[in-house]
Amino acid sequence: MTLTKTSLYSLIIPTVLYAAGMGQSAIAATTATTKISAAIVGGGCQITAPSSVSIRNGELIPAEEITTTSDISETFDLTILGCKGYGLTPSITVEGDSDGASGENLFVSTGSTSTGYGILLSTDGSSNFSPSDNLATDKKITAQTKEWDKTYAATLNGKIPLKATVSCGTCTANDLQGGELTASLTFNFFYN
């Protein structure tokens, strides 16, 4: 009988320990939740400008009113919206024919019939873009100095004020001639 008792204990003890171990692991089970996110470098913005800007609402401008100090101009906004992305430096290029015959680079389309006159395009800049007294010089609106590698593109949404001024540059061109003056411009947004 002693032998049977020992066998019974040897069966019960491992069974109880096994059951206790299973119960213990069920009680000790936990869960962990992880949210994975990433900031992807790249992106872009939409850029819009008025389809046309008429200085003095298209009224005639007497040539004698156009001097080195005159301000015959119209303002308009370049709008940046829908910006998405992260970590790159924005820039805006300005495409358009320009001429320096007046002593200063001015925008003027080849179809213009006036001579020695052009459009002096300038900007006061914005919180994100630097000012420029003459965009025909380097044909770009440059970004302010910031930590762009740590900046979300959504901060670029907004307006950049521009000013189009009828100009004769230094007004020293030998053959200043009145006529129709046009300047066709294209603004391109880059996020590099």
Task: Identify the function of each model-found stretch.
Residues 2-5, 21-192:
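Mature extracellular/passenger domains of Gram-negative fimbrial/pilin and adhesin proteins
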Residues 10-21:
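Bacterial N-terminal signal peptides
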